[in-house]
């Protein structure tokens, strides 16, 4: 296989992979919005438990956001520091 063709295939597949990795950012966004909405409902029901509810929500959102950040890192690596290009020879 021609080196230029192989490089084109690797770059194309890497772009598709980066796009798929960024789709993974939808999950944390939807989940965090849902959690924030439920936290607001909980505070409306029990205003005295506001501190506990908010701190638990923020901890949960931080854990959920880590998956979105990991997918962003993978997408950036595939686009700008592609490890597969060095394997072509």
Swiss-Prot record:
GO molecular function: identical protein binding; lipid binding; proton-transporting ATP synthase activity, rotational mechanism
Annotated site residue numbers, Reversibly protonated during proton transport: 65
Pfam families, sorted: ATP-synt_C (PF00137)
GO BP, sorted A to Z: proton motive force-driven ATP synthesis
Cross-referenced InterPro entries: ATP_synth_csu_bac/chlpt, ATP_synth_F0_csu, ATP_synth_F0_csu_DDCD_BS, ATPase_proteolipid_c-like_dom, F/V-ATP_Csub_sf
Superkingdom of the organism of origin: Bacteria
Chain segments annotated as transmembrane: 9-29, 58-78
Membrane topology type: Multi-pass membrane protein
Cellular localisation: Cell inner membrane
Keyword Signal included in the entry's annotation: no
Keywords: ATP synthesis, Cell inner membrane, Cell membrane, CF(0), Hydrogen ion transport, Ion transport, Lipid-binding, Membrane, Transmembrane, Transmembrane helix, Transport
Family: Belongs to the ATPase C chain family.
Quaternary state and interactors: F-type ATPases have 2 components, F(1) - the catalytic core - and F(0) - the membrane proton channel. F(1) has five subunits: alpha(3), beta(3), gamma(1), delta(1), epsilon(1). F(0) has three main subunits: a(1), b(2) and c(10-14). The alpha and beta chains form an alternating ring which encloses part of the gamma chain. F(1) is attached to F(0) by a central stalk formed by the gamma and epsilon chains, while a peripheral stalk is formed by the delta and b chains.
Listed PANTHER family: ATP SYNTHASE LIPID-BINDING PROTEIN, MITOCHONDRIAL (PTHR10031), ATPASE PROTEIN 9 (PTHR10031:SF0)
Job of this protein: F(1)F(0) ATP synthase produces ATP from ADP in the presence of a proton or sodium gradient. F-type ATPases consist of two structural domains, F(1) containing the extramembraneous catalytic core and F(0) containing the membrane proton channel, linked together by a central stalk and a peripheral stalk. During catalysis, ATP synthesis in the catalytic domain of F(1) is coupled via a rotary mechanism of the central stalk subunits to proton translocation.
Record protein name field: ATP synthase subunit c
Taxonomic placement: Bacteria, Fusobacteriati, Fusobacteriota, Fusobacteriia, Fusobacteriales
């Amino acid at each position: 296989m021609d080196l230029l063709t192989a490089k084109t295939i690797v770059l194309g597949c890497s772009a598709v992979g980066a796009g798929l990795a960024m789709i993974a950012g939808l999950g944390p966004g939807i989940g965090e919005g849902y959690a924030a909405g439920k936290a607001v409902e909980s505070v409306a029901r029990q205003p005295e438990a506001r501190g506990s509810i908010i701190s638990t929500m923020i901890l949960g959102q931080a854990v959920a956001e880590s998956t979105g950040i990991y997918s962003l890192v993978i997408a950036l690596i595939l686009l700008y520091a592609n490890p597969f290009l060095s394997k072509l020879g």
